[in-house]
Amino acid sequence: MKNVDFCTFGVKLGMTQILDNFGNLVPVTIVSQPKPCVITRVTTSLNSQQKLIIQIGCYSDFRANKPTIGYFKKQSVPNLRYLHEFQTYKNNEYQVGKSLDLKELDQQLVQVSAYTIGKGFAGYQKKHKFSRGAMSHGSKSHRRPGSIGAGTTPGRVFPGVKMAGRLGFSRRSIKNLLVLKVDLTNKLFLLKGSVPGKYGNLLLVSLKKTNYFLD
């Protein structure tokens, strides 16, 4: 649970390019906000400062079990599928059941967290960029892994040896992405650069305390 100024969910719609004030092409990612709302609001005291623990959620969930349904019913909010909890010192901006306003992100540097594209089971060359063997006639070790350790001593394979396996679908975060534009009517905003994952991927966009407005 991190201490941030603002946090919301987003959905990656795709990438395009726009022109800045100097006529340069800037690659941007179009992100939509899936109407997240505040679920819980708990006030704690730390170093004589009032700190809020906020829980937000998005997307309706019809498969929730009874304890979860009871939890949402107690908070007077609909059943939500994706939840996230964060801490903030802004006491008056988060009310239970209210949606989050995107104007907080305009011209700010944000951190985006998401899952990368899953590529399935991959070999040594694709996953770890290993060099392959000779491709000439007579060679039998084109893409084989080779040795993975010694023999009798130590008689085992050490943990952490790079081998073939699943590639992708890892949680990754990118810091200091600039929010170029915010469309409050359509709940869209433009991020400079790329973000992890495929189109339609759920993103977690957070605004840190160290960020500042850019002129």
From Swiss-Prot:
Assigned keywords, A-Z? Chloroplast, Plastid, Ribonucleoprotein, Ribosomal protein, RNA-binding, rRNA-binding
Its Gene Ontology molecular function terms? rRNA binding; structural constituent of ribosome
Q: Does the keyword RNA-binding apply?
A: yes
The principal location of this protein is plastid
UniProt GO BP: translation
Residue ranges of region Disordered?
132-151
Q: Subunit notes for this chain?
A: Part of the 50S ribosomal subunit.
* Protein's UniProt name: Large ribosomal subunit protein uL3c
Q: Whose protein is this, by species?
A: Cyanidium caldarium
Upper classification of the organism: Eukaryota, Rhodophyta, Bangiophyceae, Cyanidiales, Cyanidiaceae
